[in-house]
């Protein structure tokens, strides 16, 4: 019996000692350890050198932070890699001491959680400590020796609590949320759970600091007990970081705080934030709280270099708040930020339900609130289903809200608002484009946009656009704030536009009044585009869209649309979608069905003959402009039309046919 127990003890000892295997090309070639800390300590002491590979064969319980120091002094390595053995799924846990599980201070390090060379996540790194925990930190406090070429990928990172701390911090040697020095850091395909902040990257503001770093394909959207709480990804002071294809959302909703999917903070520059999905972020706390998909508040970068951040092709959906003094914003641009591009983003389902007052609280798809000469381009964005109780012109429901500043180019955006909040006491004020407190001459260049507010609730006032000046700027002429203002489509189920500088605003009901009051817009239209749906703002490529086809002006800054489709070089479409109306529906007389249009050519009255009831006849010129229409009649008088070619659209029991007609 004693012999059996002795053998068992030996076997268990061998198993325990084989949890972490180390192989090196210099120094001690191979060794085994019970913890990653043991392996890192040996590397720091110079026991293993050269190219070092660490293989995890079973779970480990770390008793303190596993810190890998810089290769200097006794430590001498070319590179270090850590990964689970083939076929092994393992967990590395530290539940006994404060501090991170891993602290990476040495360059040329790769932690890959896949056990088969793919994107599978087979390694979990867990901090089970109860207070203020962090899972992985990395960085340098030495400007002459920045941390570089570190990759952390294919892992599951679980923090001990979500009341404080982060899943991953990239900063300085101490691993605190203080600025450090680093470049070429890659954080890829990690699942980050139960954190206060998912990824926190902060650099000392210096040209090139952070360059080449990539945060991509991470999942920060766990729900339930393992949900994250405050913020998905934070960048501060970095230069040249890419944040792409991350999934962020499902945050804890209980606390009164400002939640953000992605935050570009002070001195962040030359970043590209693209193709991220931000979904289901909000606050259910009556005391307050706000939700923002992407916030850019960077000011100028190092050496006053323009921040030049790009926000591209992100999908931001289902943001909400129900609290006092709360706000909901898809993309928020503020500070003295310069050179930002916000393009090809899709923003929908933003909801602020705090009501019960005369003004309510707002929600906006995109908010622009920078300083002067911001050189900001906002183009090719879809914004829809934004709703709130905001009822003042400075705090309404806005598709795009330009709140202050200048240097804005707002081109080819599509905004479609269809909902508002109305509890019988408070009502929202939906405005597709809202301009407030902008007074600088030629501050805004506004062309090729679609601004539509189309509500089913007729008791709620709604506007396609508004301009608001506080009493301090009551004498400002709205015409002076635009450098260009034309080739836009406006539509509202209530009034088209409003100018508010006093307690009695000026309501504008048609394009002529808008042209007179706002200025320009000679080529703008009042029309209701036929979108695919309330949240899919692609234009239906049918004859119903002829009226708005090819009505834009060519702009060099917008060569493609929201999908990357090349735009017409001379007469592009208005809005974010470049579309082509199908021409095969045109009936030139050779392929007539049971619908007959005659006489053709016509002098005066045109008749539509059909065995079904005709619900609509519309006449368009060759440019697609609606000239005349009648409903529930099979004749239309064309006497006053000039001679030429026209297209007649007939609608019979929902079926549409286009016929080319010659007017004598």
Features from the language model and the residues they span:
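Acidic Gly/Asp/Thr-rich repetitive segments characteristic of extracellular carbohydrate-active
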Residues: 22-56, 63, 101-103, 514, ...
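Right-handed parallel beta-helix
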Residues: 107-121, 148-159, 179-196, 209-225, ...
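C-terminal outer-membrane/trafficking sorting elements
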Residues: 587-664
